[in-house]
Amino acid sequence: MSSTTVRPSVNALATPLVEALVADAAKLRLSVSAKSGEARLVDAGAQARGSIEAGRRIAEICLGGLGTVTIAPAGPVAAWPVTVTVHSADPVLACLGSQYAGWSLADEGGSSGFFALGSGPGRAAAAAEHLFEELHYRDHAAQIALVLESASAPPASVVAKVAEAAGVTPDAVTFIYAPTQSLAGATQVVARVLEVALHKAHSVGFDLAKVVDGIGAAPLSPPHPDFIQAMGRTNDAIIYGGRVQLFVEADDAEARGLAEALPSTTSRDHGAPFAEIFARFNGDFYAIDKHLFSPAEVVVTSLLSGTSHRAGRLVPELVERSFA
């Protein structure tokens, strides 16, 4: 990807999607708070009930307006046939430059104990992560949006931190938040199936400039009131039921190497529901082999040769065990 190429503003593209979400708050079962001079807060699943459709739209906001998310009754897991499909014609910017939950936000010095990972186009306006140096990208926009996997609204300290980092006033920021246990939360997490493949491609050192297009799909996980079980189900949807196809401007050797490196089957921890793996490591998320966080099955198509290279495998029985 050339640094001289004119890059779209992910926040500008996402702004109409955010405004449509807010306008439809009642029918999507969302709660919106917008006080003068303060950040706009959209509760999509904490105190508000939220909805699957809200989660689908939030996923498109997370992609910075550079991707489409659809939900359809089809898929490889017979007992759970509803599938979330994600497509982007600019998957690196959409997934890594916007959707990736890479910004750690905490109530530093406060007493709330608030912590959440920020995702969505607001990340690109702040560019607080080293990843943006590698992407040669920073967004500049009058309005920004950030999505939080959280059961509570961000405290004033986090709002101030985000606004300052992005170079905007607090009232120019929209926070959309929902816990993984909610309908919207589960949906938008499963919609990260393409993103985890891009993140894995980055982590194994593949030249991201060669990634041209991408599409991914995973079964929609049912929500669970327990956080660990809910997190486990969304992870299992991708790890054991996720499928991704990347289209790369690379030769067959590179495409084959990428395909072989991407699937979750490369992980030493592959083979059990995520909640069980999490318990095995006593709740230490970072002790789990990072190679596990990948789609189950990957196809990498070389646009230079027309040959597609496949690796990994679906494990529908583990999806069914997790979702039951």
From Swiss-Prot:
EC number assigned by the record: 3.5.4.27
Protein name in UniProt: Methenyltetrahydromethanopterin cyclohydrolase
Protein family according to the UniProt entry: Belongs to the MCH family.
One GO cellular component term: cytoplasm
GO biological process, one term: one-carbon metabolic process
A molecular-function term among this protein's GO annotations: methenyltetrahydromethanopterin cyclohydrolase activity
This protein's pathway: One-carbon metabolism; formaldehyde degradation; formate from formaldehyde (H(4)MPT route): step 3/5
UniProt organism field: Methylobacterium sp. (strain 4-46)
HAMAP family with a match to the protein in the record: McH
Subcellular location: Cytoplasm
Catalytic activity entry: 5,10-methenyl-5,6,7,8-tetrahydromethanopterin + H2O = N(5)-formyl-5,6,7,8-tetrahydromethanopterin + H(+)
SUPFAM superfamilies: Methenyltetrahydromethanopterin cyclohydrolase
